[in-house]
Curated annotation (Swiss-Prot):
Keywords: Acetylation, Mitochondrion, Transit peptide, Tricarboxylic acid cycle. One of its GO terms (biological process) is tricarboxylic acid cycle. Belongs to the isocitrate and isopropylmalate dehydrogenases family. The modification N6-acetyllysine is found at residue 199. It comes from Macaca fascicularis (Crab-eating macaque). GO terms for cellular component: mitochondrion. This is Isocitrate dehydrogenase [NAD] subunit beta, mitochondrial.
Amino acid sequence: MAALSGVRWLTRALVSAGNPGAWRGLSTSAAAHAASRSQAEDVRVEGSFPVTMLPGDGVGPELMHAVKEVFKAAAVPVEFQEHHLSEVQNMASEEKLEQVLSSMKENKVAIIGKIHTPMEYKGELASYDMRLRRKLDLFANVVHVKSLPGYMTRHNNLDLVIIREQTEGEYSSLEHESARGVIECLKIVTRAKSQRIAKFAFDYATKKGRSKVTAVHKANIMKLGDGLFLQCCEEVAELYPKIKFETMIIDNCCMQLVQNPYQFDVLVMPNLYGNIIDNLAAGLVGGAGVVPGESYSAEYAVFETGARHPFAQAVGRNIANPTAMLLSASNMLRHLNLEYHSNMIADAVKKVIKVGKVRTRDMGGYSTTTDFIKSVIGHLHPHGS
């Protein structure tokens, strides 16, 4: 999404909706974001943009090392403010969470690794990852699934976008034991948030020149919850007559993605479905190591891998694929209006993959993470030496 102005067009679209009162908070936030851009421009004059970095768990720290090494070699004017938050390394507390939130709110932009959520219930249902999303209102997760030239997969020349609502739905952390051995889990679906993510998807399609939006749902079974989501998507679709609108049941969508993914352009869906489809679609173009992602609120932008996987079994083995994180970092630079550096890094990563001499194990090669980083750095200035 292009720079900080991307938030402005989204907010203007939301404010122009039929119920302006529903978007009043976003309008106020957009004004704050505009002010933050002025602050960022001041920082740029001084030499760097402040960005919050959250390495996370698993191979996250190794991937962030790759980002820092490539940024250093490319002379990117970004200053990382690094924080550590982990539920599995005893590095989590309310104080640490507030420190991270404070940094992210001040900088408006962050790059993060996967914060692993343990299976065990320890008295708190909401993970730190989920709490960060809620407190920053990171309602829209965007994953651009695109084939990488030179890397052959079963389906090539894919180009589709998955937009996921990620502040409600099944991830509402509302569970309780109503009777011994009986657990009730509540799925929350609201008109305001369903309208908001639908408008985001159609605005995204309009801005990016895409022709179709597919709403993914299970309204045939969850007639009220997913029924409301689907109704909101249908209502918003009427405001965009130039964008083709389709609906598809989630289970059929999974099958269609495997059989004929070329039929899709932009897909919009509730929280849990988005989490599943993100990972499924990433597998179509090479897996979790090659697909970047990002999350947006009206004020903040967070850049991460598209398929959130800590890859704990690879920790310390120097085999993690930094492609997804480097491409996400490139998208972050574009968001900051650092187009030159963004293109330089993205082009270097894609050249390494296209040449095919340096590939990590997940891509069928034997190269290490370090090998990949060095190769990317070597392709940053192909005509400069």
